[in-house]
């Protein structure tokens, strides 16, 4: 702002020099600032082109000029700038020296300058850096900032040192006494004991009397047999033998021969005589005979009887539907029919128990204690059920698992149809059961088996394992229409 005011003052001085071109030896003019107590002349309006927003008050206060000391021809230029009403206050004497304070002063030079905006000057050089200001007072502490987002998860810390060993816990409550174990099998015969120690040496006999040479005596009788030696101590227990190799699976048994034809059943009782049938309908009339040859003309006879009825005419059109007749009365109950022949329903069922615990793996389990097997379809020797009647069957098992895990599979048509397992160790006891419906054809076989190291099926005085199956309905009855 100060630079702009100085530039306007320089332009004003140059304009005044052009007006007074006749005086070649014009001294430098001097300006004095008007006192601040004087008001701005009425009608004096500064150019709006030099004002900025917020600076109008400053320009208004500095618009008044200093009082002249003497009159001069230069008054014309001052009057043309300030207006007609400014002549009473502002008068500039010719060639008088005055001073001008440009601080807060803006000169309106609209009448002496061109209205065309001048070109923008080049930016000035950057001034030197000013001295460092004094350190300001410490500001009041700011408000606490908002909580920042959660930082990334830190790296896993190093493993801590091992803690001290804790005190020994109190002893647990003694458990219930276990069930008595089964009697073990007879062990193998022990090795032959070592020879017992020799007996003590007998006392020395008395010296015999010296005699002459005698003849050789005969051979004496054999001495009595000595006493048996002491029984040797039992030998050390031999090492446990290794597990035998897996046996080969047996071939399927041959199909049994067809059974003999059963004896003919007893003849049924003769049925009662039926009721007399209703009277039959009348038969249709016969066709007329062929016409005979014409005979000789006879005498005129008497009027004969009417001739035969001619043949029936063609069938007429279908008549309209008649009205429905009334409902007839309920007929009387018929006579009871004769007793029919009884049909034999095919049957097949079995139920068997396991007699030894922990059956061998990967082979049919032999449930050899038969409870029911009238048709003989289940074989306790092979542990397999042989289907003789095709149809839909129901199979079930309920087994006890103890001491080791068990994996049970139900096999039908040489394929595992169902698999289940029980995980037990120690002396734990549990039960497993199954109910399954299967459709079988004649000759199909069904059995149960366990896997290696998963054969924990158990039987005992208080525990049983059972396998059962029966025919639900044969295939023939299922295919018949009602």
Curated annotation (Swiss-Prot):
Residues 130-189, 217-276, 283-342 form the Collagen-like domain. The modification Hydroxyproline is found at residues 141, 144, 174, 177, 180, 222, 234, 288, 306. Gene3D superfamilies: 2.60.120.40. Not N-glycosylated. Expressed in the organic matrix of otoconia (at protein level). Expressed in neonatal sensory epithelium of vestibular utricle and saccule and also in otoconia. Residues 137-153 have a biased composition (Low complexity). InterPro entries: C1q_dom (IPR001073), Collagen (IPR008160), Collagen/C1q_domain (IPR050392), Tumour_necrosis_fac-like_dom (IPR008983). The modification 5-hydroxylysine is found at residues 189, 315. It is found in: Secreted, Extracellular space, Extracellular matrix. Keywords: Calcium, Collagen, Disulfide bond, Extracellular matrix, Glycoprotein, Hydroxylation, Metal-binding, Repeat, Secreted, Signal. One of its GO terms (cellular component) is extracellular region. Homooligomer; disulfide-linked; probably forms homotrimers. Interacts with OC90. Interacts with CBLN1. The C1q domain mediates calcium-binding. This is Otolin-1.
């Amino acid at each position: 702002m100060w630079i702009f005011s100085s530039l306007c003052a320089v332009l004003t001085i140059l304009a005044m020099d052009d007006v007074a071109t006749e005086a070649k030896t014009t001294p430098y003019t001097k300006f004095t600032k008007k006192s601040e107590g004087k008001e701005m002349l009425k009608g004096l309006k500064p150019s709006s082109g030099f004002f900025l927003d917020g600076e109008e008050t400053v320009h208004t206060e500095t618009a008044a000029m200093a009082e002249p000391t003497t009159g001069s021809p230069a008054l014309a230029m001052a009057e043309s700038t300030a207006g007609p009403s400014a002549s009473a206050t502002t008068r500039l004497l010719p060639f008088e020296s005055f001073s001008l304070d440009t601080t807060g002063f803006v000169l309106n030079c609209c009448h002496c300058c061109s209205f065309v905006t001048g070109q923008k000057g080049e930016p000035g050089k950057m001034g030197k850096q000013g001295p460092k200001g004094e350190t300001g007072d410490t500001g009041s502490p700011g408000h606490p900032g908002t909580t920042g987002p959660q930082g990334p998860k830190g790296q896993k810390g190093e493993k801590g040192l091992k803690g001290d060993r804790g005190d020994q816990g109190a002893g647990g409550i003694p458990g219930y006494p276990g069930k008595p174990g089964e009697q073990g099998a007879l062990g193998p015969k022990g090795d032959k004991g070592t020879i017992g120690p020799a007996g003590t040496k007998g006392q020395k006999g008395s010296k015999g009397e010296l005699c002459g040479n005698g003849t050789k005596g005969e051979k004496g009788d054999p001495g009595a047999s000595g006493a048996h030696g002491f029984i040797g101590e039992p030998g050390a227990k031999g090492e446990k033998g290794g597990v035998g190799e897996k046996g080969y699976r047996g071939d399927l048994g041959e199909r049994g021969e067809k059974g003999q034809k059963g004896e003919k059943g007893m003849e049924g009782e003769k049925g009662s005589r039926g009721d007399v049938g209703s009277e039959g309908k009348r038969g249709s009339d016969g066709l007329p005979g062929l016409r005979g040859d014409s005979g000789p003309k006879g005498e005129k006879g008497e009027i004969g009887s009417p001739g035969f009825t001619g043949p029936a005419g063609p069938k007429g059109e279908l008549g309209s539907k008649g009205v429905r007749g009334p409902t007839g009365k309920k007929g009387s109950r018929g006579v009871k029919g004769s007793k029919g022949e009884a049909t034999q329903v095919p049957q097949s069922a079995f139920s068997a128990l396991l007699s030894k615990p922990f059956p061998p793996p990967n082979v049919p389990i032999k449930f050899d204690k038969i409870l029911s097997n009238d048709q003989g379809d289940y074989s306790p020797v092979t542990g397999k059920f042989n289907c003789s009647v095709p149809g839909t069957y129901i199979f079930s098992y309920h087994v006890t698992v103890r001491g080791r895990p068990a994996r049970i599979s139900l096999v039908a048509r040489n394929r595992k149809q169902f698999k289940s397992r029980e995980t037990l160790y120690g002396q734990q006891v549990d039960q497993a059961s199954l109910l399954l419906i299967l459709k079988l054809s004649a000759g199909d076989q069904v059995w149960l088996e366990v896997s290696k190291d998963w054969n924990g099926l158990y039987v005992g005085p208080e525990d049983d394992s059972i396998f059962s199956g029966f025919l639900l309905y044969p295939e023939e009855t299922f295919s018949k229409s009602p």
